[in-house]
A protein has these predicted regions:
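Adenosine-nucleotide cofactor-binding segment
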Residues: 6, 10-84
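Glycine-centered, small-residue-biased loops immediately flanking beta-strands
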Residues: 17, 96-97
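Short, acidic/turn-prone active-site loops that include or flank metal/cofactor-
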Residues: 48, 54-56, 102-107, 130
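Rossmann-fold NAD(P)-binding glycine/threonine-rich loop
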Residues: 82-86, 90, 102-122, 134-138
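Short beta-alpha connecting loops at secondary-structure transitions
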Residues: 100, 120-127, 150-151
Length: 215
């Protein structure tokens, strides 16, 4: 998915003419489309697509069709899954770059890549785990200028007392980033459940937070 990368791509000075966001989870795609309305970015000259590849018989064929048959200049792979890496390779266009962002924990992890395209179509691959210092400074400047909004990545908030349990159960908790406030005592709470939490816990703080989220 990569909502941080998406907001970055859509709001920099040099922006793509097309962005295709894929996922297997329809709820995540629906949330992403709500945060980044297709029609809004169409007015800015960006063709934005949200595609659930899990519902497609032939994801590669459909993604290539969306690209106009040319493939993609840049493909970001966020899952260390062999089938996803192969799919990423298969949809690269000429001189396309596959950015393997998902760091695998298995030292023997490997996947198939089309080396015919490496030779004849100049496709290539790189691995990243984040930006360098200059990139971080740039992202902070863009955030301060309100051109990008890192908050789109956050789906839950909690206090320091929720950090340990959240960390241990992270794979089981749906949604995106979990934001922990180190100076507060607060159970981990989904942003879309803040108003409900205000009623159940009889705590106006959650209602105030819900108002901020809804604003």
């Amino acid at each position: 998915m990569g909502l941080g990368a998406l907001t970055y791509a859509l709001h920099r000075d040099v922006r793509p003419s097309m962005v295709v966001v894929t996922d297997l989870n329809q709820d995540r795609l629906d949330r992403a489309e709500e945060l980044f309305p297709v029609e809004t970015y169409k007015k800015e000259g960006i063709e934005l697509h949200f595609v659930n590849t899990g519902k497609l018989e032939d994801p590669v064929a459909e993604l290539l069709r969306i690209s106009g048959g040319t493939g993609y200049d840049d493909v970001f792979c966020y899952a260390p899954v062999a089938a996803v890496v192969k799919q990423s390779s298969d949809i690269l266009g000429r001189d396309g770059c596959l950015n393997f962002f998902a760091g695998p924990t298995d030292k023997n992890f490997s996947a198939t890549m089309n080396f015919y395209d490496v030779h004849y179509n100049s496709t290539h691959v790189m691995g990243t785990t984040g930006g360098n210092t200059a990139d971080m400074i740039e992202s902070l400047e863009l955030t301060a200028a309100k051109r990008i909004n890192p908050a789109v990545m956050v789906t839950h908030i909690g206090g320091l007392d929720a950090a340990a349990e959240t960390t241990l159960n992270l794979p089981k908790i749906p949604g995106g980033k979990k934001l922990i406030y180190t100076h507060l005592s607060m159970p981990l709470t989904a942003l879309d459940e803040l108003r409900k939490a205000a009623e159940e816990r009889n705590d106006d703080r959650y209602a105030a937070l819900a108002d901020i989220v809804d604003a």
